[in-house]
Amino acid sequence: MLPAANIGDLFLIGTGGFIGASLRYTISSRMPKIRSIPAGTLTVNFLGSIVLSLLTFSSEPESVVYLVNIGILGSFTTFSTFAYETFKLLEDGQNVSFFLNIFLNVILCLLGVGIAYFALRL
């Protein structure tokens, strides 16, 4: 477990949060929906799963964990947006897209973790 954060750690987390949120907006705003599925959220969650796993499995120093894992990737990936967009699909009566979005997010993010895990074992 990581120790309590000091001001330097909080600065790294905040800086990373700014970078991650900016990247998420940039990617998500340029991705079209595919069959009503919010591809931007799916893309950032998939990419974030890969990068987070690569860093976690390779035991990076705490400063990298604060900046990248917690800061950048914490604001880059987004479970709350995924939940809202998925619920909106259900509310709009797009039942197939609702289930497909859940399936794709879970499977692709797990696949991303697996890719990172096995890539570091090569």
UniProtKB/Swiss-Prot annotation:
InterPro entries: FluC. Na(+) is not transported, but it plays an essential structural role and its presence is essential for fluoride channel function. It catalyses: fluoride(in) = fluoride(out). Pfam families: CRCB. Keywords: Cell membrane, Ion channel, Ion transport, Membrane, Metal-binding, Sodium, Transmembrane, Transmembrane helix, Transport. It is a multi-pass membrane protein. Na(+) binds at residues 74, 77. The chain crosses the membrane at residues 1-21, 37-57, 64-84, 98-118. GO terms for biological process: cellular detoxification of fluoride. It comes from the Archaea. GO terms for cellular component: plasma membrane. It is found in: Cell membrane. One of its GO terms (molecular function) is fluoride channel activity. Belongs to the fluoride channel Fluc/FEX (TC 1.A.43) family. Fluoride-specific ion channel. Important for reducing fluoride concentration in the cell, thus reducing its toxicity. This is Fluoride-specific ion channel FluC 1. The lineage of its organism: Archaea, Methanobacteriati, Methanobacteriota, Stenosarchaea group, Methanomicrobia.
